[in-house]
Amino acid sequence: MADPQIITIPCLQDNYAFLLHDPSTGATACIDVPDAAPIQAALGAQGWTLTDILLTHHHWDHIDGVPALVEATGAKVWGAAADAHRLPPLDHALAEGDTIRIGALEGDVMDVSGHTVGHVAFHFPAATAVFTADSLMALGCGRLFEGTPAQMHGSLEKLKMLPPGTLVCSGHEYTASNARFALTIEPDNPDLIFRVERITAARAAGQPTVPSTLAEELATNPFLRADAPTVAAPLDMEGADPVDVFTRIRAQKDSF
């Protein structure tokens, strides 16, 4: 059987949407719809038919293109039941632990509240990918507009348990800025230093830095490393609860 295919689609100023395609059935899902036009262009270039739309959370820059894309394709819309009142009309309302099917591909729904309450991620083991939008991001995590630091930390702890080779398909090209901040937390982390060099080269060449891998994030993302002594020590928080360390890091990033 042919492997699932994932395409990263730049949208708006710095957003990403993703197409997930199951070659065995022809089913194709779009994860988040910042703008319909670039997604339709990508579908046309691949010769794929959109069957499903998966929404991670209610922010406008992740859902504004949904009406136009539904009108053009008739795709079914999936999203969190808890967020249904702030999402476009849903054909399938979801909660943590639910399984979704895109063709022959099964995906697990994860509650990753923090950036918003009701934010979900979609983990597709057969595609070795998790679509995290504004929860776990490349070298960062989403700003806490609605949830608490404890909620976001708990969400990230769930994501940390996925296989290290999992592709982290996050929702924005914020990686260069996140890298500059990460270096203020762990300036001597050799994995981070090497990753920043690759990020700088990719952006100079106009290439996306998303998706990353969970292994990269575990080694370099300060928001996944609140339990690491090398992260806590510069904050004078040795031995502190990782939730408190995470809270401090998030506060520093908010004013960075």
From Swiss-Prot:
What residues does Zn(2+) 2 bind to?
D61, H62, D134, H172
Record bears the keyword Hydrolase: yes
Q: What is its EC number?
A: 3.1.2.6
Q: In which pathway does it act?
A: Secondary metabolite metabolism; methylglyoxal degradation; (R)-lactate from methylglyoxal: step 2/2
Keyword set for this entry?
Hydrolase, Metal-binding, Zinc
Partners and quaternary state? Monomer.
**What name does this protein carry?**
Hydroxyacylglutathione hydrolase
- Tell me which species this is from: Jannaschia sp. (strain CCS1)
Name the gene that codes for it: gloB
